[in-house]
């Protein structure tokens, strides 16, 4: 329900929404879902890990190993790379009152398909995000979700794969992704400013926001 809450909070003017990434108390531990939650946090208004002194509730990436740790670190680094885009979209939010995250039906209120993907949302003006919120299929070793692409051309944010949605009602997709990827689509012609990851002496430099 976290992607749904994150998107629909905008309906009541609550654009600065966050969640306890990885959960907080109770529940059960699932490392792959922890990594998927990191990915949702990367494409949320506020990216906030929740933790405590207990190893069970500690959500920091150094509490994990292997492919889960790698996926978590990649998500945090991507969030840092997205800072110029986030700054631009938050300036837009302050100027125009448009939140960073919007349900799909905001831009196409008369399209019934826009209401059929409650976990999918627009992230700023250029990106669509369809988070994976279930465990990976044990056979395929991939996570699965359904996505809807409005009419037009779209590109996978990570590998540049092209998707064409040539119907006015849009295109529904069954999307499978490895643990280190989450379904994010950029519209054709979109501009997504990113910054390079700082290394060496530049990590704490004033030039590195």
Residue ranges and their predicted role:
Residues 1-188, 195, 199-203:
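Catalytic-domain carbohydrate-binding cleft regions of carbohydrate-active enzymes
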Residues 206-209:
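A glycine-rich beta-turn/hairpin centered on an aromatic-Pro dipeptide
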